């Protein structure tokens, strides 16, 4: 950590010191970060963003898993929805901003739509791939014991697909988080994305950098404490 601070401070002095534009010193960023923590602005912005992305990710999870099951269970669904989902997944979330504004206006629904479209494809593909990669031997054993299609799906396919699904879930979260940050640029709301853009517009570069660090820290914490632990649990129970 000290090495990175030294490199940063050296770069700050090389590029002009106090006269540099858009490249604040590490100490000014640390001070801005401290102020954001103590005045509560960082916590309120982060809480609003996490709540917002939670709604969008939950909706994406519901739709993505449903579409993944349809694609896996039906050849017609695979033919009709497979290429469409793959195409949606390949689009950067920022591409959905014009449609969100056109269809929903400048409001929370537009942000929710961007989060949904940014993450639903990843969850759908993870669901499909997890179910597809179940060994044929498991299918034959289930058939031998007389399991119905839905019994096989619930008791054989779903547990076997959980390790792949857990990895896809973590990836879907990362897409949802990045989509949220893009979506919060649409309208000035309480959130880390809007706070980042507001700092840029007001030339508050230390606060802008501090907000970026807040975003990174929050991303790492959620990834490690929530999805990392979930993935670890799934692999210990159903994986290898």
Please tell me what each predicted stretch does.
Residues 44, 48-52, 102-122, 161, ...:
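Loop-to-helix entry region at the N-terminal start of transmembrane alpha-helices
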Residues 14-58:
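Periplasmic/extracellular loop-to-transmembrane helix junction in inner-membrane transport proteins
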Residues 113-117, 149-183, 206-210, 214:
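Transmembrane alpha-helices
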Residues 192-230:
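Hydrophobic alpha-helical transmembrane segments of polytopic membrane proteins
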Residues 126-168, 192:
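Short cytoplasmic-facing helical segments at TM-TM junctions of multi-pass membrane proteins
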Residues 228-240:
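Short cytosolic juxtamembrane segments of multi-pass membrane proteins
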Residues 66-102, 125-132, 140:
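Cytoplasmic-entry segments and transmembrane alpha-helices of multi-pass inner-membrane transporters
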Residues 10, 53, 57-69, 73, ...:
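Hydrophobic positions within alpha-helical transmembrane segments of bacterial inner-membrane proteins
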